[in-house]
Amino acid sequence: VDISFFPEDPFALDKLAKENNVTAIMDCGVAPGMGNIIFSYHDQSMQISDYECLVGGLPKNREWPFEYKAVFSPIDVIEEYTRPARFVHNSQLVVKEALSETELIDFDGVGTLESWNSDGLRTLIDTMNHVPNMIEKTLRYPGCVEYLKVLRACGYFSKEEVNVNGKKIKPIDLTSKLL
């Protein structure tokens, strides 16, 4: 069972797993993962035309400046802020910039949260291609997106090495360590 994101196509492992009599379960965290399982369960008993997964790891106690605690690899969290978001609209694959189409959503007992398009559908794009509208949105406390856009624009999420006092570092490595 794999719960981490990796950029390669997870279906590429299918043949290798079958050849070695191995059951491989990829992308089995909260989302993708548990959300996919719940979606599939309901898909077996009803016709689904719209699937919207709202997901976010929010700390119980909000602490400035991020009001967020990474519950998995910090680099993978940062990837959510830089990797283009893929979703399905009217049976067509749509790709948007990370952190796009921000909206505020009110939740009883929680309050207002900020959401944006994220790239968590992963295998659902292929395995549930009969569902014409599917999207995943990440949730954070309000104000997070603008803060992240500033960090991204300043290069803190860059994978390109920079020279700092004679040492080459990738800004994303430093940022993930500090977060």
Model regions: which residues?
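Rossmann-fold NAD(P)-binding glycine/threonine-rich loop
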Residues: 3-26
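Conserved, well-structured beta-alpha core segment at the onset of a catalytic domain
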Residues: 23-32, 92
